């Protein structure tokens, strides 16, 4: 016997919390944030910059570093990226196949700009930063033969042993074990498949910030206030195996229940604070805390039960993770700088008071988790003292897995579905290279960072007055 699983679709629209934290729309499961420090110079050194923080990008990276600047300075950066979001597309639980769907920028986008002005006692800065931009679509559908139309790769499935009433008596079993049960009782095991779906996300966060820093002896302290603007639309559209509409689930930053409605921007005010200690010209250390913004992003759904009209499921909130980190910088010789950072990203903020669209899963306490990540960054810069000095840079950083993961029980079909679609992912190792040319009042830097799932190129310019 084969049944189709209404994974993550609306089972009921009652008894929901008035407010909750995020939801289980597939395109949000592995969302890639850009918590790295801005600037091609930092990117080329594996993002290790907190202990150095010696140019205008420090306004966002670590505002305490602004005190090292003695002249007004302007920075502009553009980035181009390509990333892959991975969905479970086929296989039998737990032996599943995952496929990457590429998201990329169509052009070089302006992702950071800052202006810094030092005075006798304070250094002031103002900046623009784009820490999050993601737009793309993935699908889990049967793959058919181009000539015969027959399915050659089906959507993910699993098998459950059941009693005489069709209730599961245990967790998923293999196809072979299911066939063995059916030899004595044809109805002792049921095969389930997920419904085909398409899931898409379009999300962007923009930041306008002002920073101030001052120095006391060998210590510098800085802070920034950030007005953060956020826009999001994420949805999953499900169909039946015959291609008929089944359900649609949507999270957006405003009410989008009318056909012509477009998600509107939400804003929040957050703060950052940092310090830097530079006992001599060979060593410095710094630290920073960045508060994550919170944005109202309600969740809606439409099914046959709602007469295919959108109904609000919950007033969910999108909480950008908090970030805090420490870094050191060492200059053994004047032309060589070595940096190391440790950055803690609280991805668990994404699932605080999480609400599932599936009623069965919603009843499970803390069914979803997102692991906090400790990013380790290491990089270096070497300057060649030529007529036009130029630098070469290289770095490495480790991005631990932090996707939204289903960790609840798997004793019935509604619970196995999320385990298939929201699995634990892999750590990512990033390698970066970069370079730059420096004139007395102008500097241009470029860098490239890559991992298995993410690639980004950057070019930035600095001018001093």
What does each model-found stretch correspond to?
Residues 40, 52-61, 67-151, 205:
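Outer-membrane beta-barrel translocator/receptor signature
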Residues 61-62, 364:
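Short structured motifs
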Residues 11-12, 71:
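Repetitive helical segments and hydrophobic/amphipathic motifs
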Residues 21-43, 110-112, 116-465:
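Outer-membrane beta-barrel porins/channels
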Residues 1-6:
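Bacterial N-terminal signal peptides that target proteins for export
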Residues 15-17:
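N-terminal signal peptide c-region/cleavage motif recognized by signal peptidases
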């Amino acid at each position: 016997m084969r049944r189709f699983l209404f994974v993550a679709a609306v089972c009921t629209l009652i008894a929901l919390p008035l407010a909750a934290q995020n939801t289980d729309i597939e395109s949000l499961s592995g969302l890639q944030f850009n918590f790295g420090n801005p600037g091609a110079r930092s990117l080329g050194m594996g993002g290790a910059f907190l202990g150095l923080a010696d140019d205008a990008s420090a306004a966002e990276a670590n505002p305490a570093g602004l005190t090292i600047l003695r002249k007004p300075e302007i920075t502009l950066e553009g980035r181009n990226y390509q990333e892959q979001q991975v969905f479970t597309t086929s296989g039998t639980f737990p032996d599943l196949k995952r496929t990457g769907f590429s998201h990329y920028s169509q052009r070089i986008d302006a992702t950071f700009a800052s202006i810094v002005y030092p005075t006798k006692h304070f250094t002031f800065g103002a900046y623009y930063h784009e820490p999050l931009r993601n737009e793309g679509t993935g699908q889990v559908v049967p793959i058919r033969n181009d000539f015969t139309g027959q399915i050659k790769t089906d959507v993910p499935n699993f098998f459950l042993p059941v009693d005489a009433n069709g209730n599961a008596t245990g967790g998923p079993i293999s196809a072979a074990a299911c066939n063995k049960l059916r030899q004595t009782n044809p109805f002792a095991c049921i095969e389930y498949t997920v419904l085909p779906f398409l899931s898409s996300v379009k999300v962007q966060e923009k930041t306008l910030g002002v920073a101030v820093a001052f120095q006391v002896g060998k210590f510098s302290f800085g802070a920034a206030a950030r007005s953060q603007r956020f826009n999001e639309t994420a949805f999953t559209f499900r169909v039946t195996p015959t291609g008929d509409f089944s359900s649609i689930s949507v999270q957006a930053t405003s009410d989008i229940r009318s056909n012509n409605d477009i998600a509107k921007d939400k804003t929040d005010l957050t703060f950052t604070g940092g310090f830097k200690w530079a006992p001599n010209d060979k060593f410095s250390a710094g630290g920073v805390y960045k508060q994550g913004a919170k944005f109202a992003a309600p969740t809606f759904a439409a099914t046959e039960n709602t007469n295919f009209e959108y109904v609000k499921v919950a007033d969910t909130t999108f909480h950008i993770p908090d970030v805090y980190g420490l870094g050191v910088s060492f200059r053994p010789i004047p032309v060589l700088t070595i940096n190391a950072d440790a950055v803690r990203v609280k991805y668990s903020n994404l699932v605080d008071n999480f609400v599932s669209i599936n009623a069965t899963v919603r009843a499970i306490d803390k069914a979803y988790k997102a692991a906090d990540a400790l990013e380790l960054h290491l990089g270096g810069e070497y300057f060649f003292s030529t007529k036009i000095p130029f630098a070469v840079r290289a770095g490495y950083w480790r991005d631990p897995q932090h996707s939204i993961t289903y960790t609840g029980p798997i004793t019935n079909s509604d619970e196995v579905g999320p385990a298939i679609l929201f699995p634990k992912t892999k750590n990512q190792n990033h390698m970066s290279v970069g370079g730059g040319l420096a004139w007395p009042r102008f500097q241009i830097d470029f860098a490239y960072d890559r991992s298995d799932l993410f690639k980004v190129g950057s070019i930035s310019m600095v001018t001093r007055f």
